[in-house]
């Protein structure tokens, strides 16, 4: 095992973290689950169901018109309640009303085994058989690719596969604890992942928290230590197998890996994931088990501080750095790749001469505030930006939090100007939205770089 030390970055210590024991004893199965278009950029669905249809767990809901063979399946049994579309008929979400029996059973129905399932170990199967089973079951959608951050194309073969067993985002659950006791599923899953590439399979974990997956000729364990983004797949790929046009890498996380292993072992993957529910407004942060795509409208309600209405809280699917607001019947659901739900206080206040305050409770990457010399502790972060958008000033803040070997200020400028050629020269193909979350947080100009990055990536992909 090699140890990789990350020097640049920033850990945001936020109040409201769940207990560190990693136990997720509580199960929450909501009345609705959904598949969200925002999870699959560039995907164009070909619908296989319509509103009112009854579906069982594992039934095909739609396929990707742009990538034939990639199927998106129902996470739980129920009835298709609605299919929502936006401007120019862009797919936004498909909502399933969960069967009462499914809810009473804790979302544990096995569904139907794929026709290609044999119960044999992946080592005894051909590469093509492994791919067909993943596609038929819908588990293929757990695999994402760099560059571009799309669901992997089954017609291609990556240079390497990354199994991510660490997460350094604020309030994130420990991926190793989330799959504790599932050594067999992890071993079968790693064997299946090795069938997807002729190159190495990297198992990336935090130093001292190794994932119990066997090491082999092509399965290599790598340990990372340091501040965020030390626990992101993008940085692991950047360090171990950098991507560019024609050189892909695929990645998936530990819980999806265990689900794939269970699929090959039993004929059915997991409908549930361990999810962290955290944030300063919560009186009882917790680790929960919840289905993929769970409705978040009432998910955090039992744990909010008394006396606060929903308008004063923002529920975020994912990390506070790279997640998205999740509310309402259209998009108020847990994202496919999100393992945490973050709740923050809405802060619309404007502080007169706030920049003159000592900032004893401020969360900042600079040393301009008193908090930088006080003992490190978790702080009550809100949604406030402490100012409006302004011009970029390259004072070194960006480079301080940019762990990639990319000139951060130049990258930010290229993204905002949509200078496609310059962005590609700088290495934008190695990034997706979560990789620029710290740039947004640290930006003195209050810019959000994730949408700008996605526009640049879409243009690069379209132009080939």
Q: What are these model-derived regions, one by one?
A:
Residues 1-50, 221-224:
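N-terminal, Lys/Arg-enriched amphipathic/low-complexity engagement segments
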Residues 43, 49, 66-69, 284:
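Short, solvent-exposed loop/turn positions at domain surfaces
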Residues 49-63, 81-82:
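Short, well-structured beta-strand-loop connectors
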Residues 69-77:
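Short coil-to-beta-strand transition motifs
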Residues 84-298, 302-464:
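Buried, small/hydrophobic-residue-enriched core segments of structured protein domains
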């Amino acid at each position: 095992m090699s140890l990789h030390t990350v020097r640049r970055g920033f850990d945001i210590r936020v109040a409201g973290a769940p207990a560190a024991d990693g136990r997720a004893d509580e199960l929450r199965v909501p009345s609705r689950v959904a598949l969200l278009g925002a999870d699959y950029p560039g995907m164009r669905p070909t619908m296989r169901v319509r509103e009112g249809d009854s579906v069982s767990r594992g039934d095909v809901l739609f396929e990707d018109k742009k990538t034939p063979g990639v199927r998106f399946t129902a996470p739980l049994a129920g009835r298709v309640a609605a299919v929502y579309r936006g401007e120019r008929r862009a797919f936004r979400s498909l909502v399933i009303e969960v069967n009462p029996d499914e809810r009473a059973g804790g979302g544990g129905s096995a569904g139907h085994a794929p026709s290609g399932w044999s119960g044999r170990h992946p080592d005894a199967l051909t590469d093509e058989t492994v791919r067909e089973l993943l596609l038929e079951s819908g588990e293929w959608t757990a695999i994402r690719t760099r560059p571009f951050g799309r669901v992997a194309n089954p017609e291609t073969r990556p240079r390497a596969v990354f199994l991510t067993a660490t997460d350094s985002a604020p309030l994130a659950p420990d991926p190793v604890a989330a799959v504790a006791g599932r050594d067999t599923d992890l071993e079968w899953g790693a064997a299946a992942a090795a069938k997807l590439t002729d190159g190495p399979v990297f198992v990336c974990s935090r130093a001292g928290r190794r994932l119990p997956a066997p090491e082999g000729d092509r399965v290599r364990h790598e340990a990372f230590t340091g501040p965020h983004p030390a626990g992101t797949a993008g940085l692991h790929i950047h360090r171990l197998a950098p991507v560019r046009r024609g050189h892909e890498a695929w990645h998936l996380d530990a819980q999806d890996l265990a689900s794939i292993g269970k699929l090959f072992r039993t004929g059915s993957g997991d409908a549930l994931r361990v999810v962290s529910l955290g944030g300063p407004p919560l009186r009882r942060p917790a680790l929960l088990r919840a289905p993929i795509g769970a409705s978040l409208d009432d998910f955090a309600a039992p744990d909010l501080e008394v006396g606060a209405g929903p308008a004063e809280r923002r529920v975020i699917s994912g990390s506070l750095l790279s997640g998205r607001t999740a509310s309402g019947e259209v998009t108020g659901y847990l994202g496919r790749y999100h393992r945490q739900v973050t709740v923050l206080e809405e802060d619309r206040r404007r502080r007169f001469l706030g920049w003159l305050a000592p900032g004893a409770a401020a969360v900042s990457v600079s040393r301009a505030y008193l908090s930088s010399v006080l003992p490190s502790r978790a702080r009550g972060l809100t949604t406030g930006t402490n100012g409006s958008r302004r011009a970029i000033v390259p004072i070194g803040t960006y480079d301080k939090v940019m762990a990639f070997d990319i000139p951060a200020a130049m990258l930010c400028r290229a993204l905002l100007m949509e200078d496609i050629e310059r962005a590609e020269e700088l290495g934008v193909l190695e990034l997706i939205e979560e990789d620029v979350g710290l740039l947004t947080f640290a930006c003195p100009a209050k810019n959000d770089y994730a949408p700008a990055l996605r526009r640049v990536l879409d243009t690069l992909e379209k132009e080939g």
